[in-house]
Amino acid sequence: KVLLAVIGAAALGGGYYLALTVADAVSAITMFFVAVLLVILGTYCLFTAGSIAVLKLLRKNKNYYYKSRHFTTVSGMIYRMKQNAVGLANICILSTMVLVTVSTTLCMYLGVEDALKRRFVHEVSVVSYYNAMPEHPEEVDALAEASLKDSGRVLTGHSAMLNMSLTAVRTDDGFSVTGIGAGTDYSISDVVLLTILPKSDWENYTGEMVGELGSGEIALAASSACEKGMLALDNETYQVKQICAYPETDHDYLDDMADDSVFMIVPDREALGQIFTELKQDWDEERVSLQIKYNMAFDIDGTAEEKVAAENVLHAAITAYNDGHPSDDAKDSYSRTYVECRAQNRDEYYSLNGGLLFIGLFLGAMFLMVTVLIIFYKQISEGYEDKERYVIMEKVGMSSEEVKESITSQIRIVFFLPLVVAAIHELAAFPIVRRLLALLNLTNVRLYVICMGITFLLFSAIYYIVFRVTSQAYYRIVDGKAI
């Protein structure tokens, strides 16, 4: 029993550690199920062995144990835990499933608007891809702007940025782009989203001015700490002249999968083209294509219907432009342009998250039904087992009130212990679930906390009602009447 209790404590501690220390969203995906399995193992071990070990320690404490109230309670609890430990562990795990499943899917549905605004920072996002440095990327920008204005919409916001976004891995002296995924040894925590862009595009998009940059000089803006000095990008070395503030607002071009993001700001578009050419020479085109991007973002006025109508016109205009510039033309640097619109994706988001909410409520109801059945069976079976013990306790001199008080305290401890442990499990799962929700563009922590609170209160109310109903049945069996 002691060994089992130690194993349970270690497993539960390991599961909690993984959940509480997860560093990024990618790690959360890989660690979530490992943490769940460890917590389940730890819960079973601690309920079956840990609880009894604690009670036996209390029994060895003579000053505590040899009191009429404590004597009967501790003795009765040892007996009850030996008989019902597995059932209580089942109730605890099922309760945790209900709390986590319902609160998560409820948050996903109520946070649709937040997710939309994070995924589509602007009403309309247009991205053009190029196989080489484009000479006039603003051509598509002008087409998109004219299309929206022709639809009768007023542009309330407009920005554009030429850039190259890459998945890189941190090295001792900088970043490696061409080596990632090519048999090199690196940790997922070293992966970073590297966005390289000209100084003028950075200033236009963020509004932050950058000092003069000479040849071989760059500025950096990173989500984590960075310093001035020399920085290597594969085979080239650059002088970091300035550290810029990392943009506080989200941008359409940021990859939510990357927990660590770095902007590398170069002097001009010619410098960007030179880096692109150098990387292209060592790039594995069969693995993934290396392209230049031109991001355009628009905010427009109008009702939801008017925005959708304008976006449909824009889609048609961009489709016609793509048809006139085939991406398989080797002489043309142009590849293709894509359009994303917030209004057109709203119904899809609500449908998807509404379906997930239904599944979450269905699974929650199913887990709850199983929990209620286990509780009801446990209470009824305990009632028949305790009937003789109830009579014996009265025969040895305990009053009816003392017997009822002792048994009632035992039942309450046994009954509410799984709920308390389930609440602790849910709190421990908070960091890792929050990371997983961030992958779905749900970063409203306050909303998730509210959903957790509402779910716990509703579940606790149902749990208490079940306790009252089954307790009445228990007392009728034991004493012949309800109390």
Please tell me what each predicted stretch does:
Residues 1, 384, 475-483:
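Short cytosolic juxtamembrane segments of multi-pass membrane proteins
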Residues 1-58:
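Hydrophobic alpha-helical segments
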Residues 4-6, 36-40, 84-108, 347-388, ...:
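Hydrophobic alpha-helical transmembrane segments of multi-pass inner-membrane transport and secretion
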Residues 13-31, 418-480:
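Short helix-loop junctions at transmembrane helix boundaries
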Residues 47-95:
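N-terminal Sec/SRP start-transfer signal
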Residues 50, 96-122:
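Alpha-helical transmembrane segments
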Residues 115-129, 134-369:
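Basic-flanked hydrophobic alpha-helices used for secretion and membrane insertion
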